[in-house]
Amino acid sequence: MKKFKKSKIFYIRFTLFILYLVVATALVFTSVVQSPVVVDIKSTSTVTATPTAIITPTPTLLPPPKIERVLIISYDGMRTDAIEKAPMPNLIKLMQNGAYSLTSAETIAYPSTLPSHASMLSGLCMQDTGIYYDRYFKYLGYSKGVDIFDLAHSAGLRTVMIVGKDKLRQLAEPETTDVFEVRYDEEAISKVAVEEIQKGFGLMFVHFPSPDKVGHKYGWMGYSYLKMLTNGDNALEEILKALDDDGLRKTTLIIVTADHGGHDKNHIGTVIQDFRIPWIISGPRIVPGELTIPIETMDTAATTAYALDLPLQDNWEGIPVYEAFGEPRLKVHKAYIQHPCHE
C-alpha cells in the first residue's frame, strides 16, 4: 500500500513536471515566433507610409539669343546728370535693363563732335583718325584707319548712318555705308531710322544733334537743353517700338552714348563735365548692372566689333567692355593712371 502511494505521488509530480515543460516551451516558442512578425509589420508599415518618388526632368537651359545686329545711338552733348533731370524715361528703362556707366566713361582730349565721333566709331585716338577739326572739310577726306563700318560692310552686313549734322559724313567712306541720311531734328531722324529698321540692318548709327545745338545757344542743363533731351527720348521710344514690332529687339544690341558733355555754353575741355559721357548697353548676352571700370569712347567700336564677331584691330586703342557681357577682363586701359587719347 505504501509502495502504491509513493508511485502515485511520483506519477503526479512527473506529470506536473511534463506540463510545466510543455507550457514553458510553448511560451518560449510563441515569443520567438511573434518577434519577427512584429518587426515585419513595422517594416511593412514604414514602407507603405513612404510616398512614391516622382522624377522631375531637369529643365534645359537655352543659350541667350545671338547678337545679329548693333544699333549705336549718340546724343550730341548729353551730360550724364541730365538723363534723370530731363527726364528720359525710355533711356532710364534701357539703362536699368542693361549695363551702364554714368561716372567712369570719357571721351577724347578734344571733346568736340567730329573728332569725338571719329574715335567712337574707329576705336582710334584723334592723332590716328586724322580728324583734328570740327567742321566739314570735304576735301580732307574721311577718318583714317579701319572703322566698324569698314568691318561690318566687308562682312556683308547692311550698314546705315542717320545723322543730324552734315560734317558727320567724314566719319566713314560712302562705299562702306549702304545708307547715309541727314535730318536736322530728332523726330525726322527717328522716322528714317524706323524705315531702315523695317528694311533690316546689321549696323546702324543714329545721331541726335539738338542737345548740343541748344546747349551752345541757351546753356547746358537749362530748360531748353533738357527739353531737347526729352524730345530725343521720345525719338528713342519710336525706335525701340519699331524693333519690337519687327521682332528684332531680342537679337539687337543697343549702345547709347554721347560724344561729349558741356557746361555753360561750351565744351572746350576745362571741366570734367565736358569729358564725361554716358555709356549704356542693352540687349542679348548683357549682364545688367553698373559698370565702374574706366571706359573710353573708342571702346564703343571695339565692343561693337566683338559683339558681331568682327576682327578687332591691333592698332585700336579701344577695348571691348567685356564686363558688360559678364566675361573676365582680357585687357585693360593703361588708363588706370592716364586715359588714352588724353596725351
What are these regions (language model features)?
Residues 2-20:
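N-terminal Sec-pathway targeting helices
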Residues 78-79, 209, 242, 260-261, ...:
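Catalytic metal-binding/acid-base residues of hydrolase active sites
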Residues 310-342:
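Polar, surface-exposed loop/tail segments
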Residues 166-177, 194, 198-234, 238:
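Active-site His/acidic residue clusters
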Residues 66-69, 77-199, 306, 320-324:
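Active-site-proximal alpha/beta segments of enzymes that process anionic O-linked groups
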Residues 121, 270-311, 322:
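Substrate-binding rim/cap in mid-to-C-terminal beta-strand-loop elements of soluble/periplasmic
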Residues 25, 30, 35-65, 339, ...:
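Ser/Thr-rich, Proline-interspersed low-complexity disordered segments
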Residues 71-72, 90, 228-271, 304:
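Metal-dependent active-site segment of extracytoplasmic phospho-/sulfohydrolases and closely related
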